[in-house]
Amino acid sequence: LFAETRARSTSLAAKAADVVGKSLAEEEKKDLDKISKKILNDNEHTDLIKNLATLVKKGVAFHHAGLNQNCREIIESEFRNGKIKLLASTPTLAAGVNLPARRVVISNINRYDAKFGANKPISILEYKQLCGRAGRPQYDKFGEAIIVGNSNGTELIDYYVNGTPEPIVSKLTDDRALRTHVLSLVSTTPGIKKDEIVGFFSETLAGSQIREPTIKF
């Protein structure tokens, strides 16, 4: 269940907990109680952690960058094992993590865009990425994706389902991002020469897209 913010993912998990909890068998409740205790035993008892542990007892969890690595790994592992039945997450879980989700629900197609200072519909590319979490080949024969939207369903299908993803554009063309990565490269590669820095970034996606040296001294 994908949400647009950390707070929203936590809220959706809480709303789903009572419904999911009613469908659990006694043996499942025992397993979830152990997972809940592990979360509490391994982490500082902040309000966030205590809330997570409470929801896990009902077969539900949330997942976002506000949780530490230990909690995220426990949640991912137990969802993968089928112990946690429903996972509410921010879009960060859409990339790089392979989880056995039969069904993906996109709870809101709008995201806040700081550049424009307003909410904007997600891109077709992000939609495809989110939906791609459902029905992973090694876990399921098929997957389902559901959009919760306010507009006409046919329009959503035409735009998102039948639409072509936008071209991928490197973020390194942004001065701030490039500066951060240059400093990171220099700090982790003692003795690196100027032409090596230029060569390194010229081989990135940004370098290939602008077809000229990414960095100029």
Predicted regions and their residues:
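Generic beta-strand/beta-sheet core signal
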Residues: 2, 63, 87-90, 106-107, ...
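Alpha-helical scaffold elements adjacent to nucleotide-binding pockets in ATP/GTP-utilizing enzyme cores
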Residues: 11-16, 74-77, 100, 126-130, ...
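Conserved C-terminal RecA-like helicase domain
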Residues: 2-86, 114-125, 199-202
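C-terminal accessory/connector segments of nucleic-acid motor ATPases
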Residues: 68-79, 162-217
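Conserved segment of the helicase C-terminal RecA-like domain
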Residues: 99, 103-161
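Beta-edge loop/turn motif
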Residues: 72-108, 115, 132
